[in-house]
Curated annotation (Swiss-Prot):
GO biological process, alphabetically ordered: protein deneddylation
Protein's UniProt name: COP9 signalosome complex subunit 4
SMART domains linked: PINT (SM00088)
Residues recorded as bearing N-acetylalanine in the entry: 2
Length: 406
């Protein structure tokens, strides 16, 4: 039957008639090819593609018929459709400028098949082949933005944050031009994930936290974004930016619903965190967040050591490297190195006396510390009052009336 389709196509290519009549006859042949099955169907469809890209066929007809052809293929088995898509892209390549719209459609559909198969890299690379900026066709902003975001997301799924960042940067140039709110949200999610994968944790936390307030996002997804914001903040390097983010999250009552709230509370209140308190939190982290740093420690270990060092700087005026190492549960030399790095980067105030083996912490102002402690106490008292009100609303109402009457 494939041979019959090929013969019909050869006869039609040598015949004359109006575009409308010829297009109708080609559609009949396409329908006949679609009705076949197995190898016969595959060969017939390939023959149809070869006919469409032949220069003897009018470009008006071939573009129209290739568009129709693309609408039929999703109904075929994925294995057949994939082979036909690849064959079509190969045959169209010499005349790709003439069939840009059809090629873009084929690449989108082929990428969907690869995505379904969880072949993320091939899906991304197929979409990269769409000439969004260099082609003859003018693509609208939303189409380009959506495609770049899809490529970035696919590279993230393939654990390639470098390529993902390259395409999210291209999307960044377009997102201000788009009025599609859904695409704007997708951009923010993807950008936050790229920052997260690239270990730019404080920037990722800020983006995730921003998403957690977007009313267009479903409530469960907002809470998920808040959870990611909290995890990224805990993993971020100690310093002023992280302290500000910890304060923002600690004041957000929604964080009390999250499993990692206990760690957040300890970090915000500058308490020393012990290694055995981290096991439950470590199990919640995503694979890329469990990576090790250059010195062999995990990202979480490094973040907690820096936090504990900053907490120690608020407890002591000075401390020897040996004592500091014991406090941080790490070798003295490593404690010295981390303290030196934090002081050099301006993330901790102090200086190191290497002759005596002591790190000196510069005295902090008492007033801001008192303010922070009072603020924390008020916050906790407010939480207690809310819980009492929920448990015993009638008693709370009577107590309030009695207070007002005094």
């Amino acid at each position: 039957m494939a041979a019959a389709v090929r013969q019909d196509l050869a006869q039609l290519m040598n015949s004359s008639g109006s575009h409308k009549d010829l297009a109708g006859k080609y559609r009949q042949i396409l329908e006949k090819a679609i009705q076949l099955s197995g190898t016969e169907q595959l060969e017939a469809l390939k023959a149809f593609v070869e006919a469409m890209v032949n220069e003897n066929v009018s470009l008006v007809i071939s573009r129209q018929l290739l568009t129709d052809f693309c609408t039929h293929l999703p109904n075929l088995p994925d294995s057949t459709a994939k082979e036909v898509y690849h064959f079509t892209l190969e045959k169209v390549q010499p005349r790709v400028i003439s069939f840009e719209e059809q090629v873009a459609s084929i690449r989108q559909r082929l990428a969907s098949i690869y995505e379904k198969e969880e072949d993320w890299r091939n899906a991304a690379q197929v979409l990269v082949g769409i000439p969004l900026e260099t082609g003859q066709k003018q693509y609208n902003v939303d189409y380009k933005l959506e495609t770049y975001l899809k490529i970035a997301r696919l590279y993230l799924e393939d654990d390639d944050p470098v390529q993902a960042e390259a395409y999210i940067n291209r999307a960044s140039l377009l997102q201000n031009e788009s009025t599609n709110e859904q695409l704007q949200i997708h951009y923010k999610v993807c950008y936050a994930r790229v920052l997260d994968y690239r270990r730019k944790f404080i920037e990722a936390a800020q983006r995730y936290n921003e998403l957690s307030y977007k009313t267009i996002v479903h409530e469960s997804e907002r809470l998920e974004a808040l959870k990611h914001a909290l995890h990224c903040t805990i993993l971020a390097s100690a310093g002023q930016q992280r302290s500000r983010m910890l304060a923002t999250l600690f004041k957000d009552e929604r964080c009390q619903q999250l499993a990692a709230y206990g760690i957040l509370e300890k970090m915000y209140l500058d308490r020393i965190i012990r290694g055995n308190q981290l096991q439950e939190f470590a199990a919640m982290l995503m694979p890329h967040q469990k990576a090790t740093t250059a010195d062999g420690s995990s990202i979480l270990d490094r973040a907690v050591i820096e936090h504990n060092l900053l907490s120690a700087s608020k407890l002591y005026n000075n401390i020897t490297f040996e004592e500091l190492g014991a406090l941080l549960e790490i070798p003295a030399a490593k404690a010295e190195k981390i303290a030196s790095q934090m002081i050099t980067e301006g993330r901790m105030n102090g200086f190191i006396d290497q002759i005596d083996g002591i790190v000196h912490f510069e005295t902090r102002e008492a007033l801001p510390t008192w303010d922070k402690q009072i603020q924390s106490l008020c916050f906790q008292v407010n939480n207690l009052l809310e819980k009492i009100s929920q448990t015993a609303p009638e008693w709370t109402a009577q107590a309030m009336e009695a207070q007002m009457a005094q």
